[in-house]
């Protein structure tokens, strides 16, 4: 089963828009992108479970039942004080196995190529600014994809 979610979906008790840049919020862009991916999955009749726009990440993680054959994917947009910062990055758990690493690499390679931006590669959650990500505790292949930099207008176009 594929589990797909939009980071900072702007809902819940504490609204977190995520990164902001170039007139966009991360929350809105991740929902928009997630919905595009869902449309593709539906068209190909691929089964999936998605987060709801009215639930926080903790509620979503409580609701889903991942297993070893699961793929868990969450979309985000990166940001920087430097408007020239560019690229796509995949994040994996600190205890990631070879399947997590291979999936994350394929995903970031394809994303960077398709968008024509820098490939920033695969990093562990420990290398992220948060250090530890709740999503990474799920079973199966788990990846958080930073699609591009919301702060770089070229990345967004």
Q: Each predicted region: which residue ranges?
A:
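Short, well-structured alpha-helical segments in soluble
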Residues: 61-67
């Amino acid at each position: 089963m594929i589990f797909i979610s939009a980071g900072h979906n702007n809902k819940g008790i504490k609204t977190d828009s995520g990164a902001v840049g170039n007139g966009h919020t991360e929350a809105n862009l991740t929902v928009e992108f997630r919905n595009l991916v869902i449309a593709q999955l539906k068209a190909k009749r691929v089964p999936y479970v998605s987060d709801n726009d009215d639930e926080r990440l903790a509620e979503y993680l409580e609701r889903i039942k991942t297993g070893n054959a699961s793929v868990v994917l969450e979309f985000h947009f990166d940001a920087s004080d430097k408007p020239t910062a560019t690229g796509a990055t995949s994040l994996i758990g600190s205890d990631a196995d070879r399947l997590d690493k291979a999936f994350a690499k394929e995903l970031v390679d394809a994303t960077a190529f398709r968008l024509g931006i820098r490939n920033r590669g695969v990093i562990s959650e420990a290398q992220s600014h948060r250090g530890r990500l709740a999503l990474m505790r799920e079973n199966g292949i788990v990846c958080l994809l930073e699609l591009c930099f919301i702060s770089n207008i070229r990345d967004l176009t």
